[in-house]
């Protein structure tokens, strides 16, 4: 029985571990703790069973934004990561600024579908740096200030411009690794 041992929210991790241990004990089968992030890193192998190492992983989840080199199973090196907010955190916080429900990511993306991504030129931090790190806190702050003078009818443009800036930053990192 495999279960997520971390990282993650402690309450969820404890519930998962307790259920997994119970099933393992009742069925008398092996218990296998799994690192949540390693699951993301290895996910490409679900689509391509012939996936060869080394490969690069752009890991973008709620609490993590990293570029990871997978040289072989169990051997990973972080090449770049966020220096402040993770991409998912930025989406959630911008969603809150736009009066959207949690989680913000899917709701911001849905709102962005009706917006103009070129209306606001939000900052794209660390784009010219040689390293592969990310920064999304300045972008989030720029959205906060932009919203001060806007009406709700402008929110789709804000969402689209924000999302465009995030994607530009993520693509830049991918281009630096090519």
Stretch-by-stretch model annotation:
Residues 57-59, 65-69:
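Short beta-strand scaffold segments in enzyme catalytic cores
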Residues 29, 33-56:
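Conserved phosphate-binding catalytic cores of ATP/NTP-utilizing and phosphoryl-transfer enzymes
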Residues 49, 61, 72-116, 140-151:
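Glycine-rich phosphate-binding loop plus the immediately following alpha-helix
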Residues 109-174, 178:
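A contiguous, well-structured pocket-lining segment that forms one wall/lid of small-molecule binding clefts
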Residues 4-9, 35-41, 64:
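Acidic, glycine-rich active-site loops and adjacent beta-strand->loop/helix elements
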Residues 1-21, 25:
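Short beta-strand-loop/turn "lid" adjacent to the catalytic site in phosphate-handling enzymes
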Residues 5-10, 78-82, 128-131:
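A short glycine/serine-rich beta->alpha loop
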